[in-house]
Amino acid sequence: MTWRRVLAILLVGGVVLGVAPTGYALAASAGRISTVDDVPSEPVALVFGAGLDIRGEPMPFLRARLDLARQLYAAGKVRVVLVSGDNRRANYNEPDAMRDYLIDNGIPAAKVIADYAWFDTYATCVR
């Protein structure tokens, strides 16, 4: 096999491996995505952490989750937002960063509850 053929196979394989998870996620979520108007009213919205940047601010994916929770609150779909994330290290605190973000974006402090006992998603759901 020539080096060009090996390179072509590796390139195609890399593209397939890079695109396949996105394709699967899109196919698996088909029909499961709702608008804020379609979501039923519930007492609490639970927002799981998804990472902070080097400054301790929510990463883009987490900001999107928090913005959706804010929209649900503003639309009267939820009364309280519960934020749950990693805070096992002194310099990394997802619940506080998430809480601060929501308060800074218009949700009253009394309506944002932080879960500091996070270990993993399953444990949060069980509690």
Segments from the language model and where they lie:
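A structural signal for short, hydrophobic/glycine-enriched beta-strand patches
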Residues: 26-127
